[in-house]
Regions:
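Hydrophobic cores of alpha-helical transmembrane segments in multi-pass integral membrane proteins
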Residues: 1-14, 25-53, 73-99, 112-139, ...
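Membrane-interfacial, low-structure loops and terminal tails that flank and connect transmembrane helices
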Residues: 50-71
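Flexible, glycine/threonine-enriched loop-and-boundary segments that flank and lead into catalytic domains
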Residues: 102-111
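Catalytic cores of extracellular degradative/oxidative enzymes
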Residues: 17-21
């Protein structure tokens, strides 16, 4: 519920939204959305930690993470998706929830970088990991190319991290979205 209320931060630069709604959205609703996101962001890694500690990985704070099944595409896919969704997509979403910063970057390619971090890294990679879990369970067969399955979440996840960071960096430099000519020169290519 709170995440849906705070999603209006995508409308902060639009003229049809009242000032009062913008103030309420960038303050109270955004705080609730961050709270709901943090509950989600801490419960899934916490469940992973509890499962690893139940398997006996109890030495020190991070043995459970060092000894995690990183070769299992289900685990690595979910973990890479959590980091991309939570940190890359989540922190940038909170940043764009402030009206001052939103007005600066709203019509830049920074926003599609944020969307790709949340939807493509977070959601798509999680469903890929779920597929790696369900195929052997449902069909009672091994994966066709297990070596390729082990590296696929890393290749896809880190490539998307790079893609999103480049889009966000370009947006910070002012590269526009929604317009084909970022220099507004009327030239098909800026060097002509």
């Amino acid at each position: 519920l709170f995440l849906q209320l705070a999603s209006a931060h995508h409308l902060l630069a639009d003229p049809g939204i009242s000032t009062e709604w913008k103030v309420v959205n960038t303050s109270y609703f955004m705080y609730f959305a961050v709270l709901a996101s943090m509950i989600h962001a801490l419960s899934i890694p916490g469940a992973m930690e509890v499962a690893q500690r139940a398997r006996g990985y109890n030495k020190g704070l991070f043995e459970w993470l060092r000894k995690a099944p990183w070769g299992n595409p289900t685990f690595s896919g979910v973990f890479i998706a959590l980091v991309g969704f939570g940190f890359l997509g989540g922190i940038t979403g909170v940043m764009m929830g402030t009206e001052q910063l939103n007005l600066l970057i709203h019509n830049t390619i920074y926003v599609p970088g944020h969307f790709h971090a949340t939807v493509v890294i977070g959601t798509t990679l999680t469903f890929m990991a779920l597929t790696y879990f369900l195929i052997p369970v449902l069909f009672q067969r091994e994966m066709i190319a297990p070596g390729l399955a082990k590296i696929q979440p890393y290749l896809f996840g880190f490539s998307m991290y790079f893609f999103c960071l480049v889009m966000m960096g370009a947006g910070t430099l002012g590269v526009s979205r929604r317009h084909w000519d970022m220099a507004f020169q009327g030239a098909a290519l800026a060097y002509e």
